[in-house]
């Protein structure tokens, strides 16, 4: 296991061929449609994240915003994230995955229109707040829905590919933001959600949610529609129903609602999920995402060239991660991704240090561009998607809603802290700010290497039993 954490399997080529065969067999029309709908939330999320940086200058100029006003616009998104996180678990458990997707897409549309027609800061912030609430719900909902409908051998690839849509959304809006006016760009942001709404009439509900709410008779029918009418889904349906019944019996004995998550048996899974979710945020993700324009300008890089280059690299990283997640495994990609983010933060700090001390002035812009590209490429290859994949895999159905709320809260609060404080941290010390982020990334690498196990190739029920029965003993590479 120690070697598996660092090296790609020797049979990666044959594994890739097998993966392609499995993908071909699994691509039934209902599954593909459900996958696309589940992935569109990630794309909408990416569009929202990618909107701020390229439009910063024009929005501030057109609406006469101060730095404090724009800092609020950037950070109020995470206030909405916190509000969405507070309700996401209860909402998805109460009304189901599909109806919750309805709610998030309607909020996305309203938020974009509010921004597009804003004449002052209040409507601008209201639109951003509504978008934040929707993201706070969908950022966990999407991975959960996809992992619950996907076959076990494709679960990682499907979830990672879905999260790749977030990287695509960021990249598309980074690029469009250099040529499209900010109001028109907001109108374009409505299109994905408007396209999803009619498709929601044709996708199935999660079979695991159906089992949880007592609709056992529908589980096998939904699995047949997802896997194909000729597939034998009896074993999969039996495993889902058996495990759900076991969880219900435990819930009857101990029904403490949200606080049930804090029992000793969930301590390991809660720690893994929460720390993995928080690492990208505390490692400066929102700082890079919302203020890339400021970083480029401060170090002498052309903003348009920087945005386009960064977009291409992030998309490439996301594609690479999607291809490898079910071949090399989640853990290997997490380690490589986290190491790359550490390198990106460190070289960004060095570029600011050189700029501030007037050293190597001709090379500093190149180093700054390189550092941002390394950061986003590394983030896209692993830390952008895999923490949410793991978080959607490791919690039993009875605490999945509470766990989703907790993970979302941690992500949202840490994102808000970074987004709101980032501009002030840059004024304090640009070099010191990115050294802080590099330190977090380095500590995150050690955490993953020491504690995070591999979940590739296991059913959700096997993973959840593994995490709740006893912490895995074979996760360390040191």
Swiss-Prot record:
Pfam families xref list: Sugar_tr
GO molecular function: sugar transmembrane transporter activity
Membrane-spanning residues: 31-51, 67-87, 106-126, 129-149, 161-181, 185-205, 267-287, 305-325, 333-353, 366-386, 406-426, 432-452
SUPFAM superfamilies: MFS general substrate transporter
Membrane topology reported for the UniProt record: Multi-pass membrane protein
Subcellular locations according to the entry: Membrane
Protein keywords: Membrane, Sugar transport, Transmembrane, Transmembrane helix, Transport
Gene Ontology terms: cellular component: membrane
Disulfide bonds: none
PROSITE patterns, sorted: MFS (PS50850), SUGAR_TRANSPORT_2 (PS00217)
PANTHER family, A to Z: PTHR48021, SUGAR TRANSPORTER ERD6-LIKE 15
Its job: Sugar transporter.
Homology family: Belongs to the major facilitator superfamily. Sugar transporter (TC 2.A.1.1) family.
Protein name: Sugar transporter ERD6-like 15
Gene source species: Arabidopsis thaliana (Mouse-ear cress)
């Amino acid at each position: 296991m120690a070697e598996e954490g660092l090296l790609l399997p020797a049979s990666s080529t044959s594994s890739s061929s097998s993966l392609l065969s499995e993908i071909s067999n699994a691509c039934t029309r209902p599954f593909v449609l459900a996958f696309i709908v589940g992935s569109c939330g990630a794309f909408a999320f990416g569009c929202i994240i990618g909107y701020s940086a390229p439009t910063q200058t024009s929005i501030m100029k057109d609406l006469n915003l101060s730095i404090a006003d724009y800092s609020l616009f950037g950070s109020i998104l995470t206030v909405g994230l916190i509000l969405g996180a507070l309700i996401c678990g209860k909402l998805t458990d109460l009304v189901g995955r599909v109806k919750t997707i309805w709610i998030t897409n309607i909020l996305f549309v309203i938020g974009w229109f509010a921004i597009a027609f804003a004449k002052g800061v209040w409507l601008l912030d209201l639109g951003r707040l509504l978008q934040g609430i929707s993201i706070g719900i969908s950022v966990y909902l999407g991975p959960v829905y996809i992992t619950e409908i996907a076959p076990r051998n494709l679960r990682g690839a499907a979830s990672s590919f879905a999260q790749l849509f977030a990287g695509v959304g960021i990249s598309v809006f980074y690029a469009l933001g250099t040529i499209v006016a900010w109001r028109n760009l907001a109108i374009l942001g409505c299109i994905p959600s408007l396209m999803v709404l009619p498709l929601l009439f044709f996708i199935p509900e999660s079979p695991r949610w159906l089992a949880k709410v007592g609709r056992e008779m529908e589980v096998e029918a939904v699995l047949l529609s997802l896997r194909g009418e000729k597939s034998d889904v009896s074993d999969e349906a039996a495993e889902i129903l058996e495990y759900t019944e076991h969880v219900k019996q435990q819930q009857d004995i101990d029904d403490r609602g949200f606080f049930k998550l804090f029992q000793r048996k969930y301590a390991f899974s809660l720690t893994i999920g929460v720390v993995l979710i928080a690492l990208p945020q505390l490692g400066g993700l929102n700082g890079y995402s919302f203020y890339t324009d400021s970083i480029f300008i401060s170090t002498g890089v052309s903003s348009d060239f920087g945005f386009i280059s960064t977009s291409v690299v992030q998309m490439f990283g996301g594609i690479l991660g999607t291809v490898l997640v079910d071949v090399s495994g989640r853990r290997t990609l997490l380690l490589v991704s986290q190491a790359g983010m550490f390198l990106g933060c460190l070289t960004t700090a060095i570029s600011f240090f050189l700029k501030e001390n007037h050293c190597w002035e001709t090379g500093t812009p190149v180093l700054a561009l390189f550092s941002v590209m390394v950061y986003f490429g590394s983030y896209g290859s692993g830390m952008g998607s895999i923490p949410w994949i793991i978080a959607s895999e490791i919690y039993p159905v009875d605490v999945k809603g509470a766990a989703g709320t907790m993970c979302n809260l941690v992500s949202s609060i840490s994102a808000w802290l970074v987004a709101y404080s980032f501009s002030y941290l840059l004024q304090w010390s640009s070099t010191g700010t990115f050294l802080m982020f590099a330190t977090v990334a380095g500590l995150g690498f050690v955490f993953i290497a020491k504690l995070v196990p591999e979940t590739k190739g296991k059913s959700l029920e096997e993973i959840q039993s593994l995490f709740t029965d006893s912490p895995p003993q074979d996760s360390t590479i040191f």
